[in-house]
Amino acid sequence: MSQASKRKHVVQEVLGEHMVPSDQQQIVKVLRTPGNNLHEVETAQGQRFLVSMPSKYRKNIWIKRGDFLIVDPIEEGEKVKAEISFVLCKNHVRSLQKEGHWPEAFSEVAEKQNNVNRESQPELPAEPQLSGEGSGSEDDSDLFVNTNHRQYHESEEESEEEEEEAA
């Protein structure tokens, strides 16, 4: 299977499939990512441990702090105690809450994330700004500044000298 088709199938599996955790599996929240496809997670009971990411998800699915996962326990692990079996997106979280499979300890966290996402969406302005109004070259403070390049600042004296030379 090529890399592109593998990625397509993994993404379809994660986004489309509805997953309910079995008796052995548990829902956890990602706290941090120390590296090497390991993630530090916390259970609803407050227990913290490391989980490993299986190779099918590596370089295909990205997990960030605050995401929720379904994990399978690993019996022989001392530090790494589970393996990720499913990455939960917002739709999965909502459906698990409706069905009553969502842990009470994570209910407030999931609600806060939904509210923050709703509030962070920018509202469109009621009246579009005309191109002539307020879009002068004098006010460039809202432009993106690339910090990877040197910043060249032109002094007023240099700009006056250039204007005099041009005349």
From Swiss-Prot:
Molecular function, one GO term? RNA binding
Family (UniProt) = Belongs to the EIF1AD family.
Taxonomic lineage of the native organism: Eukaryota, Metazoa, Chordata, Craniata, Vertebrata
Q: What is the name of the gene encoding this protein?
A: Eif1ad
Q: What is this protein called?
A: Probable RNA-binding protein EIF1AD
Annotated region (Disordered), positions in chain: 104-167
Instruction: Give its localization.
Output: Nucleus
Pfam families reported in the protein's UniProt record: eIF-1a
Q: Where is the S1-like domain?
A: 5-89
Q: Where is this motif: Nuclear localization signal?
A: 6-12, 56-65
For this UniProt entry, what's an example GO CC term? cytosol
Biased-composition ranges, Acidic residues, are 155-167
Q: Which organism is it from?
A: Rattus norvegicus
How it assembles, according to the record, is:
Interacts with GAPDH and STAT1.
Leader sequence range is none
Keyword DNA-binding part of the UniProt annotation = no
Q: Which UniProt keywords apply?
A: Nucleus, Phosphoprotein, RNA-binding
Functional note: Plays a role into cellular response to oxidative stress. Decreases cell proliferation.
